[in-house]
Amino acid sequence: MPIDFRMTKKGLILLIESYSSIESLKQEIMAKFNEARDFFSEGDEISLMLTQETSKPDDIVNIVSLLGNLGVRVKDILVGSLEKKNVKIGQKYDLVREKVTEVRGAQVIKRNLRSGQIVVHNYDIIVFGNVHPGAEIIAGGSIVIFGTARGILRAGYSVGDEAVIAALDLKPSLIQISGLISQDYNVYETPAVAHIRTGRIVVEKIESAKFEVKGGKI
């Protein structure tokens, strides 16, 4: 089945093998949870398992947000496959969560993010700490890191080109804003910001950044 629940020694897994569109997937997930509504309680934890084909960062934001609205907490994101009746896990990312603030629904993380940890949120993400290599952040809005930024940073899945990625020390292995990706960018020893200008990602010192807005630059 394209979408199914699997009970393992480590708990319940929602397995997503395939889907035609994110909207159809959301409908299927809601139908699955409706069928099993007597099984779940508010705040229950599950693992979300995707295949290499379905582990799309922009869709992960929507899936995690939907599951939260359905009352369950995603404790980790797995990437693997279903072989016969056995679940084979290739990669595992622990989902880091903190209380959402009142500021536009931003999620504030007050810790360092280590390798194998992932933060997924539909709005802005603010990190008071370092993002180490092997960690990943996926944001619907912007990402601001009060620390050193390594790992993979993906922003703008909800707000698009208006998103920015800023850090006191911005040196990630990959930057993605909306549909644009960059691994080759200017590196500074002072606070820097990545943003989209004239259709490409640019990284500049925060103090001298020239942001593109409708009608020109500021």
From Swiss-Prot:
Please provide the Gene Ontology terms (biological process) for this protein. cell morphogenesis; division septum assembly; regulation of cell septum assembly
Swiss-Prot/TrEMBL keywords: Cell cycle, Cell division, Septation
Q: Which gene encodes it?
A: minC
Q: What does this protein do?
A: Cell division inhibitor that blocks the formation of polar Z ring septums. Rapidly oscillates between the poles of the cell to destabilize FtsZ filaments that have formed before they mature into polar Z rings. Prevents FtsZ polymerization.
Superkingdom per UniProt: Bacteria
Which organism encodes this protein?
Kosmotoga olearia (strain ATCC BAA-1733 / DSM 21960 / TBF 19.5.1)
Q: How does it assemble?
A: Interacts with MinD and FtsZ.
Q: Which residues form a coiled coil?
A: none
Q: What is this protein called?
A: Probable septum site-determining protein MinC
